[in-house]
């Protein structure tokens, strides 16, 4: 479709520059709990047929479609200023701004959208602005299908791939969509994929953010671990931890972060307290700007499933459960992956075989002499420390364990 820039005014008289998609298009949106077919013209939603597991999933799909329609009544439904930023303090693009705004509160959007009388069609019902079903009236252009949406789709499904810059390509390599030109959501909602970009985790709601964040840490544990011990600030600023912040109660973010960072610093300083599972569990909380306070916590709250659930600082909970026997992590009952190492040891992967029996204490410390190769470690006595070269030229300080690990 052709795209051209247009300036539009929100309900708060803020000017937004959006790239308008001109012409008729049809999209299949596939989320985790809802699917939909959207037919739209230039800045106009023609028809949306949505099917989902529950009221909230249906509402989320409707919001995405309404925002993507770029209709004026959606833009005029904005109350207050749009100033969502990512953690690097860059403003999100206008379409994303709108999406975030209405994901927080869509009441005005639904109220202003307009309703229409509907015909009685088998398997279809209307949906009112308060998200209750109706057989007489429905939000303009919107219908809920009880059976799923496949049979209403006239488009062929295409197999696409997404690269890490969120460019969507077909099998011939043509770019169909990219963030440069469209709200990220639309480009991905229509695809059944696990999002490779953390910007996408939020679209499927809080649970998806939680699971994806921990999956990401586990998948990248090798590099995360080295950064954790050598350059934690860089690690805390990673954009992958950004979506997670929306789950942490606003008032607690800074306190949690300060608490976790202090705890981590103690782990780096105090011998023998490196605890892989605990680091993985608490790491996302350290990403918020920390507040210095003497607050101690035994559990941290995250808002998922409509209420606060607790992650225990020490030990398992329904939100975060590590099974020592299987070495697998489950987050909210979903498998988030396996830890390839014995969490008792401070290391994994290539070095784990050789560094079994050693603790990684943190950054290189020149007082303990030049860096040894892994093979030279054999000569250390129990409790003795040394710098050792691991991985890609990284030097860390290790200590030979005083006890033999079981």
From Swiss-Prot:
Motif (Nuclear localization signal): 400-403
Listed GO CC annotations: host cell mitochondrion; host cell nucleus; virion component
Pfam families for this protein: Flu_PB2_5th, Flu_PB2_6th, Flu_PB2_7th
GO BP: 7-methylguanosine mRNA capping; cap snatching; DNA-templated transcription; symbiont-mediated suppression of host cytoplasmic pattern recognition receptor signaling pathway via inhibition of MAVS activity; symbiont-mediated suppression of host gene expression; symbiont-mediated suppression of host mRNA transcription via inhibition of RNA polymerase II activity
GO molecular function terms noted in the UniProt entry: RNA binding
Highest taxon listed in the record's lineage: Viruses
The entry's keywords: Cap snatching, Eukaryotic host gene expression shutoff by virus, Eukaryotic host transcription shutoff by virus, Host gene expression shutoff by virus, Host mitochondrion, Host nucleus, Host-virus interaction, Inhibition of host innate immune response by virus, Inhibition of host MAVS by virus, Inhibition of host RLR pathway by virus, Inhibition of host RNA polymerase II by virus, mRNA capping, mRNA processing, Viral immunoevasion, Viral transcription, Virion
Complexes and interactors: Influenza RNA polymerase is composed of three subunits: PB1, PB2 and PA. Interacts (via N-terminus) with PB1 (via C-terminus). Interacts with nucleoprotein NP (via N-terminus). Interacts (via N-terminus) with host MAVS (via N-terminus); this interaction inhibits host innate immune response.
UniProt function note: Plays an essential role in transcription initiation and cap-stealing mechanism, in which cellular capped pre-mRNAs are used to generate primers for viral transcription. Binds the cap of the target pre-RNA which is subsequently cleaved after 10-13 nucleotides by PA. Plays a role in the initiation of the viral genome replication and modulates the activity of the ribonucleoprotein (RNP) complex. In addition, participates in the inhibition of type I interferon induction through interaction with the host mitochondrial antiviral signaling protein MAVS.
Family statement: Belongs to the influenza viruses PB2 family.
Protein name per its UniProtKB record: Polymerase basic protein 2
Species the sequence originates in: Influenza A virus (strain A/Chicken/Hong Kong/YU562/2001 H5N1 genotype B)
């Amino acid at each position: 479709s052709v795209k051209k820039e247009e300036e539009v005014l929100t309900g708060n008289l803020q000017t937004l520059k959006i790239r308008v998609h001109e012409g008729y298009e049809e999209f299949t949106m596939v989320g985790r709990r809802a699917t939909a077919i959207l037919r739209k013209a230039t800045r106009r939603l023609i028809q949306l047929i949505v099917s989902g597991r529950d009221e909230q999933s249906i509402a989320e799909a409707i919001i995405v479609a309404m925002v993507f329609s770029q209709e004026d009544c959606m833009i005029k439904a904005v109350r207050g200023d749009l100033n969502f930023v990512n953690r690097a303090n860059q403003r999100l693009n206008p379409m994303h701004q709108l999406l975030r705004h209405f994901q927080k509160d869509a009441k005005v959007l639904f109220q202003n959208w307009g309703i229409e009388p509907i015909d009685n069609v088998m398997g279809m019902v209307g949906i009112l602005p308060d998200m209750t079903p109706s057989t007489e009236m429905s939000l303009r252009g919107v219908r809920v299908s009880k059976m799923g949406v496949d049979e209403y789709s006239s488009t062929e499904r295409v197999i696409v791939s997404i690269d890490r810059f969120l460019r969507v390509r077909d099998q011939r390599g043509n770019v169909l969509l990219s963030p440069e030109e469209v709200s990220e959501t639309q480009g991905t909602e229509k695809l059944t994929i696990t999002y490779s970009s953390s910007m996408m985790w939020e679209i499927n709601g809080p649970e998806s953010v939680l699971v994806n964040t921990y999956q990401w840490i586990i998948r990248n544990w090798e590099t995360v671990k080295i950064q954790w011990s050598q350059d934690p600030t860089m690690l805390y600023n990673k954009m992958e931890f950004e979506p997670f912040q929306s789950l942490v109660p606003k008032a607690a973010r800074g306190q949690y972060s300060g608490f976790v960072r202090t705890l981590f610093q103690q782990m780096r300083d105090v011998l023998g307290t490196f605890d892989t599972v605990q680091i993985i569990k608490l790491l996302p909380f350290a990403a918020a700007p920390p507040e210095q306070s003497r607050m101690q916590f035994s559990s941290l709250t995250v808002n998922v499933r409509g209420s606060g659930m607790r992650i225990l600082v020490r030990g398992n909970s329904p939100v975060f459960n590590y099974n020592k026997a299987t070495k697998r992590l489950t987050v909210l009952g979903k498998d988030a992956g396996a830890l390839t190492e014995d969490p008792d040891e401070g290391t994994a992967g290539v070095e784990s075989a050789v560094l079994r029996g050693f603790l990684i204490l943190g950054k290189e410390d020149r007082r303990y002499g030049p860096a040894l190769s892994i093979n030279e470690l054999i000569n250390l006595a129990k409790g003795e420390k040394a710098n050792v070269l691991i991985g890609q030229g990284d030097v860390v300080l290790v200590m030979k364990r005083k006890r033999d690990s079981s």
